[in-house]
Amino acid sequence: MESNCGHPMLSVSSAMYTFLLGAIFITLSSSRILLVKYSANEENKYDYLPTTVNVCSELVKLVFCALVSFWVLKKEDHQNRKLRCGSWKEFFNFMKWSIPAFLYFLDNLIVFYVLSYLQPAMAVIFSNFSIITTALLFRIVLKRHLNGIQWASLLILFLSIVALTSGTETSQHSLAGHGFHHDALFSPSNSCLLFRSECPRKDNCTAKEWTFSEAQWNTTARVFSHIRLGLGHVLIIVQCFISSMANIYNEKILKEGNQLTESIFVQNSKLYFFGVLFNGLTLGLQSGNRDQIKNCGIFYGHNAFSVALIFVTAFQGLSVAFILKFLDNMFHVLMAQVTTVVITTVSVLVFDFRPSLEFFLEAPSVLLSILIYNASNPQGVENVPRKERIRDLSGTLWERSSGDGEELERLTKPKSDIESDEDTF
């Protein structure tokens, strides 16, 4: 009985940490979407290379995690010795991190394209499609069971998104004319004047690379004209698949085997090493990027918003890593839906986003299907995520372990021998 006395306090502490982590993620995610939009110029294009934002944010995360990792490994000599003794198995385990790094690289790059064609509110609403992709990949990759109510809510969600898509008429030409943000965006640079003088003949060579030909896309997508499908809609569906795959694979390798007890900063150092590598290769391999960096430097075209975007993107990536390590993908998806509400509200107030009557009728269907999905989650798959959370938190923060009924009793009994607990998991 005495061993259970502290559990209510630990449960409150765990709930506080969970709430704080969710609030941080929502704030950073909302800020990131708004900063991407604010960092564009009057033509809704980017005067800087978007890849430079991703390179710098990955570098910020790598430096931060590497410094913390060195401090952690210094305190744990046995892990330090293990790292010195390399083997092929450890090398292949290290190379595993290249897969989510590449997927995150694609995900971060597509965001710039999406927000060139869609309002932030519409982009976030359509990104709810990630619930479907996450659920499917949960079932296939993580073998997670979904009950009938959850599948029904996913079907309602999908149909609501299709209806929402067919009922919106957002013109990409009108995007640059919203609000008052254009005048304060661009900070002209004094460098590379010669390079800039050649750009007008090439139709703004910096910004041109980051938009698609509208005429070419319209002829390609004419078959979808009856549902008013645009390039932004297709891109965001692709982004949902890529983002879901990245997060699920990342959660899998964060928690599988002995990775569960490894420091999250050591794990993230491996991930961000490949993130810097992939984004850096993109800068070097594209001739347009190479010429601009050679003549103007890597920070040409950046403004206050894009610089802030670098750090917000970095810390948002860190918050996602903490969610996947200590919670799970479904919590991440749920917090993304709260971000939807925040971005929609801000778009109405700042970007002069004026929802139609159809929007007000169909958007609640999206949010209600999300609510039904998450409300049915404890009834259908309670045991699996609960066990994962307990396993995950018990590997690092033993005092934050939580559970209900027999499950908690079973986990707290062998508390005198923590290592045997790990072996059974």
From Swiss-Prot:
Similarity comment: family membership: Belongs to the nucleotide-sugar transporter family. SLC35A subfamily.
GN (gene name): SLC35A5
Keywords (A to Z) from UniProt: Antiport, Glycoprotein, Golgi apparatus, Membrane, Phosphoprotein, Sugar transport, Transmembrane, Transmembrane helix, Transport
Protein name: UDP-sugar transporter protein SLC35A5
Molecular function in Gene Ontology: antiporter activity; pyrimidine nucleotide-sugar transmembrane transporter activity; transmembrane transporter activity
Residues bearing carbohydrate: 204, 218
The protein's assembly and partners: Probably forms homooligomers and heterooligomers with SLC35A1, SLC35A2, SLC35A3 and SLC35A4.
Positions bearing Phosphoserine: 394, 416, 420
Biological role: Probable UDP-sugar:UMP transmembrane antiporter involved in UDP-alpha-D-glucuronate/UDP-GlcA, UDP-GlcNAc/UDP-N-acetyl-alpha-D-glucosamine and UDP-N-acetyl-alpha-D-galactosamine/UDP-GalNAc transport from the cytosol to the lumen of the Golgi.
Cytoplasmic side: 1-7, 74-92, 143-147, 250-263, 325-330, 376-425
Organism: Bos taurus
Membrane topology recorded in Swiss-Prot or TrEMBL: Multi-pass membrane protein
GO biological process: transmembrane transport
Bilayer-crossing regions: 8-28, 53-73, 93-115, 120-142, 148-168, 229-249, 264-284, 304-324, 331-351, 355-375
Cellular localization per UniProt: Golgi apparatus membrane
Matching InterPro entries: Nuc_sug_transpt (IPR007271)
Lumenal side: 29-52, 116-119, 169-228, 285-303, 352-354
PANTHER family reported in the protein's UniProt record: NUCLEOTIDE-SUGAR TRANSMEMBRANE TRANSPORTER (PTHR10231)
GO cellular component, one term: Golgi membrane
Region feature (Disordered): 398-425
Biased composition (Basic and acidic residues): 408-418
Entry keyword Glycoprotein: yes
Keyword Cell division: no
Catalysed reactions, semicolon-separated: UMP(out) + UDP-alpha-D-glucuronate(in) = UMP(in) + UDP-alpha-D-glucuronate(out); UMP(out) + UDP-N-acetyl-alpha-D-glucosamine(in) = UMP(in) + UDP-N-acetyl-alpha-D-glucosamine(out); UDP-N-acetyl-alpha-D-galactosamine(in) + UMP(out) = UDP-N-acetyl-alpha-D-galactosamine(out) + UMP(in)
